Amino acid sequence: MRVAALISGGKDSCYNMMRCIAEGHQIVALANLRPDDNQVESDELDSYMYQTVGHHAIDLYAEAMALPLYRRTIRGRSLETGRVYTRCEGDEVEDLYELLKLVKEKEEIEGVSVGAILSDYQRVRVENVCKRLNLQPLAYLWQRNQEDLLREMIASNIEAIIIKVAALGLDPDKHLGKTLGEMEPYLLELSKKYGVHVCGEGGEYETFTLDCPLFKKKIVVDTSEAVIHSADAFAPVAYLRLSGLHLEEKVSSVPGDDETTSYIHNS
């Protein structure tokens, strides 16, 4: 099946792409929703649906994976927030519809890779959009045991770093920029102590993937800056602004056509 992958830059969307390929599907394009650059704090958008921290680095995915990348600015807001989603003009879900509609027209996709694990809110809305476009959602991580998933991601050579913290026990000074492998023991400890979701499904943390077996090049962070979003004494919210990045060549672990053209389509 020809598949477009919804990517946030995080570990979950990356690992679900790997699972899609393992199941015999072909990733032919990447799709991402981004905040408006004119917003004062465009790094961190208040959205129920989309991870936006790290969005400045998403363009590198097109070159790293040698795939076309389609991006759309999020124009809507979270308006229809009930358990069942009904098409609602001005809702941010309609931005996803317009994005995938374009990708389907351009790339003739049949399915969509979705990295959702636990959020019914996200699942219901992605399924609504896919049904309207006659696309098959592929969510191989859905309701998997999170400890197992984290272990699998690390074992699968996904190199992802923590770029946002928002939970009791996570310290911006100590944990921003750490890799999943470095954080695994501590995340398991926090899960036992405070009930923290080890994959961050409760919003405890977010990640950005620098390398994985699907990348033909790896992303390298040259400079970054920690930004405090909320200075709560017990659970501060902070994120890492990736201000300087470049790509480095690597030995490709993905058999494929070296002639593949990457390009970015913004709307």
Swiss-Prot record:
It catalyses: diphthine-[translation elongation factor 2] + NH4(+) + ATP = diphthamide-[translation elongation factor 2] + AMP + diphosphate + H(+). Gene3D superfamilies: HUPs, putative n-type atp pyrophosphatase, domain 2. Pathway: Protein modification; peptidyl-diphthamide biosynthesis. Pfam families: Diphthami_syn_2 (PF01902). GO terms for biological process: protein histidyl modification to diphthamide. Amidase that catalyzes the last step of diphthamide biosynthesis using ammonium and ATP. Diphthamide biosynthesis consists in the conversion of an L-histidine residue in the translation elongation factor eEF-2 (EEF2) to diphthamide. This is Diphthine--ammonia ligase. It comes from Rattus norvegicus (Rat). The lineage of its organism: Eukaryota, Metazoa, Chordata, Craniata, Vertebrata.
